[in-house]
Amino acid sequence: MSFAPVYNAHSRALILGTWPSPKSREMAFYYGHPQNRFWPMLAALTREAVPAREDIEAKKQIILRHGLALWDTLERCTITGASDASIRDVVPNDIAGLLAKAPIEAVFCNGAAAYRIYTKLSLIHI
């Protein structure tokens, strides 16, 4: 199962990944691999301090303070390691349900696989 989405009533942009990596699943939160550049990049864009790797609450607060939402395109899948190329047996997350709950105006896919899955399976266009 994927992680719960991070969003609130002020979320205007949704960032979609594909599926949590093994390190992210180990940490129980998005982009948990120490070499992943997501959190340093987001901190630079928002002029926030880079949150500690283990500080899940600080990461959630950066997302929410800046009107963002964070989720993955897949609820379940079969995957070998962290290779998006090996993904099969996909079950998409209910992205339409999330969009009905929050005033999302834009969706940004964090990679080619997330974009391909979002456009193929969700059939949602903002």
How does the language model describe each region?
Residues 124-126:
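Conserved small/polar residues in nucleotide/adenosyl-binding loops
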Residues 1-106, 112-121:
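A polyanion-binding, active-site-adjacent surface
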